Design a protein with these regions (language model features):
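Structural preference for solvent-exposed beta-strand-turn elements
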Residues: 1-166
Length: 166
């Protein structure tokens, strides 16, 4: 009743402090990636403990690669990430490669008979979603009565659109 615009009144206050962070790896790698971008800028060292099985590990690999490219040192030992504090991001020109998550829509459209030219994708990319090309090739190569099993644990973003091809 106090909020005629139907917006949630939410205020988050406080300061992110370095230290130990325990993150459930089965929920989303985005929480880990977010911490990895922020923690190097803090005063002290930090550790991220990934509990359970890490889903979407390919996305975490992309984050670690991006951090390295911009001069941030993160060490990974097992399920623990070590992040030194007081680091600075390096400024340099970068090429942003094509996004396999978005390209998956066009890859599936082509599989279903469209003729879309897809350019700008790095075939050597670390993106887990590039597996869409392998998944679609397996569908093409399969016999009509063959049962196929696809593991989308490391590429959950493409599974809904991939389902259209099945």
């Amino acid at each position: 009743a106090d909020n005629p615009d139907n917006f949630l009144d939410l205020s988050v206050q406080g300061e992110l402090k370095s230290g130990d962070f325990y993150i459930d790896g089965g929920v989303s790698s985005q929480f880990i990636s977010g911490l990895l971008f922020a923690l190097p800028l803090l005063q002290g060292d930090s550790r991220i403990f990934i509990e359970g099985n890490l889903q979407s590990s390919g996305y975490l690999d992309l984050t670690l690669c991006a951090l390295k490219n911009y001069g941030i040192d993160v060490q990974k030992e097992g399920n623990v990430l070590y992040v030194k504090g007081n680091q600075r991001y390096l400024n340099h020109d970068s090429y942003i490669e094509g996004d396999y998550s978005q390209a998956a829509f066009f890859e599936v459209a082509n599989y279903l008979g469209s003729g879309v030219d897809i350019i700008g994708l790095n075939k050597e990319s670390l993106q887990g979603d590039k597996v869409i090309t392998e998944f679609l090739q397996q569908l093409k190569d399969a016999s009509p009565d063959e049962t196929l099993i696809f593991d989308g644990g490391n590429c959950p973003d493409i599974i809904p659109v991939f389902a259209l091809a099945c």
